[in-house]
């Protein structure tokens, strides 16, 4: 999607890491670079069987029909160096499916962060890092807000202050 790639390039240019990132506009399945990567970061499409929207570009970004977890881990196994890791953010309800899929491609969970909007609410997102080595998984939780709406926790502020103006 050229528009999404242009937006990503614009975001990267205003990032402190702009000299270390590159946007390549192509089908992930057809991407075969000469060198292997040490890190892949992905915010893969979330929706599996949800109602599809009329906007094709938005659908592609949000629904797993174009990039599912099998494809993500299968091709990442090819793209990553032996010590490389893949980090993703997923909806909490697909965590077991994602971990099972990762195992099929010999990826082991290294880090797992459960993200909650506030105390007492169910986990909404899970940030996972996988690698080829079987090591103890570091597990943690993050609460975005305290008891009051938009009363952000110190942990969330520390994590996001460089990216959000409101922090």
Predicted regions and their residues:
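Short beta->alpha junction loops/turns
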Residues: 1, 91-92, 149
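Conserved SAM/SAH cofactor-binding pocket of Class I
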Residues: 1-42, 48-53
């Amino acid at each position: 999607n050229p528009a999404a790639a242009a937006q990503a390039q614009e975001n990267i240019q205003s990032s402190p890491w702009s000299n270390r990132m590159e946007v390549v506009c192509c089908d992930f399945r057809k991407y075969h670079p000469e060198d292997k990567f040490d890190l892949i970061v992905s915010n893969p499409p979330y929706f599996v069987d949800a109602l599809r929207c009329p906007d094709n570009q938005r659908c592609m970004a949000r629904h797993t029909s174009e990039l599912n977890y099998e494809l993500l881990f299968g091709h990442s196994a090819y793209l990553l160096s032996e010590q490389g890791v893949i980090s993703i953010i997923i909806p909490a309800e697909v965590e077991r499916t994602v971990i099972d899929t990762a195992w099929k491609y010999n990826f082991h969970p290294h880090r797992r962060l459960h993200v909650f909007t506030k105390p007492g609410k169910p986990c909404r997102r899970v940030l996972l890092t996988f690698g080829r080595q079987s090591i103890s998984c570091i597990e943690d939780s993050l609460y975005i807000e305290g008891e009051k709406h938009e009363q952000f926790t110190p942990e969330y502020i520390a994590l996001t202050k460089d990216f959000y103006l409101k922090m």
